[in-house]
Amino acid sequence: MRSTRTRKSETTMILEVATLIVRAGEGADFEQAFSQAQKIISSMPGYVSHQLQRCLELQDKYLLLVQWQRLEDHTVGFRQSQQYQDWKKLLHHFYEPVPTVEHYEPVFVAQHSVREGRA
């Protein structure tokens, strides 16, 4: 495993972490709506990648992880756009309560390197 410490002076991506609680019994509909909504977010300037993770212990809880080039790409570029209004129409009626959204910057990054021919 390789681990590196990032420096503030380095250009680092921002990780948006949204904790989503979906109304009971609406998970399948939420996931279907998200399959459409992800096309919106992935088209935004500054977008890098995203993952939607479902909690194993709490079936109505999800984590949305979005990497942005800069904080402002999310907080201004996306949140103040018409595309965000479209995103909200598709998804926000599923949430109970309102999602918690936080932003993180890397401190340590570790990566397991897999060598060719190794199982």
PLM segments and residue spans:
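Generic structural motif
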Residues: 23-25, 71, 106
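Conserved GNAT-fold acetyl-CoA-binding loop/helix
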Residues: 31, 35, 82
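Glycine-rich beta-strand-turn "strand-cap" elements at beta-sheet edges
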Residues: 2-11, 51-58, 88-119
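Residue-level signal for secondary-structure boundary sites
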Residues: 28, 72-74, 109
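Short, well-ordered beta-strand segments in beta-rich or mixed alpha/beta enzyme
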Residues: 14-21, 51-79, 117-118
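An amphipathic, aromatic/His-enriched active-site/gating alpha helix that lines ligand/cofactor pockets
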Residues: 39-48, 67-102
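Short, surface-exposed ligand-recognition loops at beta-strand->loop->(often short) alpha-helix junctions
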Residues: 21-31
